[in-house]
Amino acid sequence: MGDPTNNNDSETKPNPATYWKSRFPVARIKKIMQADQDVGKVAQVTPVIMSKALELFMQSIIQESCKQTRLHQAKRVTVSHLKHAVQSVEQFDFLQDIVEKVPDAPPIKAERKTKRPRARRAANEGEHNESVPAKKVKKNTVKEEEIEKDDESATTETPVKEEPTGEETEADHEEKASVDHGNFSDKTTSEASSASGDE
């Protein structure tokens, strides 16, 4: 009886990730059914069955609407996607009159354009917009991305030269000049000479 190795409880319970309990309000369904004068008494189980049928119907029409949304490469399910779902599935023919008034969805989009990376876009904007002052940046290398996949197979590195901004000191000019001419002298000697000149 109390055998811990034989646990059937895990086999009978459904996985919570795949099972959810969603029921439409049975009392409200019963009121709607009784509002019709042709309907007499309603058995107690009838609204429960109608609730389950409504749930299955909603699940079916929403799944088909999601398929239409994916076909149109949209991010949101809209009324026009619901209209296309009703028109494409024979089971939903009874809804044709209702969805006729809904405007059609835009035509299916072609492949979306690939976006340029932000870093490259910002670099290109900086080259074309000279009214914005450039930031003080030391000499760096930037990897250029492939413009077209077929043109180049590898990336190249190119040095980026910054224009002087007027905020630079004489030491910065000397350092840049020594780097540009291939003269890699000690930083300490250039700093020492500029420090002794400042005092």
Swiss-Prot record:
Disruption phenotype: Leads to only a few rounds of cell division before arresting with an elongated cell (cdc) phenotype. Residues 185-199 have a biased composition (Polar residues). It holds the Pfam family CBFD_NFYB_HMF. Residues 112-121 have a biased composition (Basic residues). GO terms for biological process: DNA-templated DNA replication; transcription by RNA polymerase II. Keywords: Nucleus, Transcription, Transcription regulation. The keyword Transcription applies. One of its GO terms (molecular function) is RNA polymerase II general transcription initiation factor activity. Residues 106-199 are annotated as: Disordered. InterPro entries: CBFA_NFYB_domain, Histone-fold, Transcr_DNA_Rep_Reg. GO terms for cellular component: chromatin; cytosol; epsilon DNA polymerase complex; negative cofactor 2 complex; nuclear replication fork; nucleus. It is found in: Nucleus. Belongs to the NC2 alpha/DRAP1 family. Transcription regulator complex subunit that is essential for cell cycle progression. This is Transcription regulator complex subunit bur6. It comes from Schizosaccharomyces pombe (strain 972 / ATCC 24843). The gene is bur6.
